């Protein structure tokens, strides 16, 4: 627990590497097309709970893992964003299922420590191209759904992207009150 607190308060945060391919603005919404690197990720899946509750539960498990709850007892340092896979229902609301990802820090990419919590899996993910929009505040389900709808409208019918899921991303620790960064990502097809 101490490692988790130290990680969130004192560590520098390593950001998931990406390259901006293009920028756009439409319908009063700014967005970017980015190429994100692949790599090793710690993943927790939670089902049967509302989005906000499931996301918080999974994120706490991942924070404990990078804080030292692993076979090496290694405090790995925090990475950003915490990336939540959301699965939209037909009406645009979110299903009661999330997969929360945290990219393993670069120095542990080659050989990630094994999680002590069996619900955490280590997955290799390929790089991907995304459409991204950013917003501030303490993001909840309603905010992510709202910005996903805005991004969908801004992209229009010209852009091809996955419709069966999207990513809800938070970059900041809970104790940061101002200047928060949240993003919605659609994966380009």
Swiss-Prot record:
Q: Does the keyword Transmembrane helix apply?
A: no
Q: Name one GO cellular component term.
A: cytoplasm
Gene3D superfamilies given for it? Regulatory factor, effector binding domain (3.20.80.10)
Q: Where in the cell is it found?
A: Cytoplasm
Q: Which domain of life is it from?
A: Eukaryota
List the residue ranges forming a coiled coil, or say none.
Answer: none
Q: Pfam families recorded for this chain?
A: SOUL
Recorded GO MF terms: heme binding
Q: What is its main location?
A: cytoplasm
Key word Cell cycle present = no
The protein's job, in short, is: May bind free porphyrinogens that may be present in the cell and thus facilitate removal of these potentially toxic compound. Binds with a high affinity to one molecule of heme or porphyrins. It binds metalloporphyrins, free porphyrins and N-methylprotoporphyrin with similar affinities.
Subunit description: Monomer.
Tell what the record comments on domains: Forms a distorted beta-barrel structure, with two helices that are packed against the outer surface of the barrel. Porphyrins are expected to bind to a hydrophobic patch on the outer surface of the beta-barrel structure.
The text of the family note is: Belongs to the HEBP family.
Q: What is this protein called?
A: Heme-binding protein 1
Species this chain originates from: Gallus gallus
In the UniProt record, the gene name given for this protein reads HEBP1
């Amino acid at each position: 627990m101490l490692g988790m607190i130290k990680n969130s308060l004192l560590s520098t945060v390593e950001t998931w590497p990406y390259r901006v391919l293009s920028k756009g603005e439409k319908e009063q919404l700014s967005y970017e097309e980015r190429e994100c690197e692949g790599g090793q990720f710690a993943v927790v899946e939670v089902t049967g709970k509302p989005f906000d509750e499931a996301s918080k539960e999974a994120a706490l498990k991942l924070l404990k893992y990078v804080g030292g709850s692993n076979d090496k007892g290694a405090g790995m340092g925090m990475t950003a964003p915490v990336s939540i896979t959301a699965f939209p229902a037909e009406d645009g609301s979110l299903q009661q299922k999330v997969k929360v990802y945290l990219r393993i820090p670069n120095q542990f990419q080659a050989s990630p420590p094994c999680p002590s919590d069996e619900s955490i899996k280590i997955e290799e993910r390929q790089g991907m191209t995304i459409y991204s929009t950013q917003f501030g505040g303490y993001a909840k389900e309603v905010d992510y759904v709202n910005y996903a709808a805005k991004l969908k409208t801004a992209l229009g019918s010209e852009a091809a992207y996955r419709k069966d899921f999207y990513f809800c991303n938070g970059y900041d620790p809970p104790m940061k009150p101002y200047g928060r960064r949240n993003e919605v990502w659609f994966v380009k097809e």
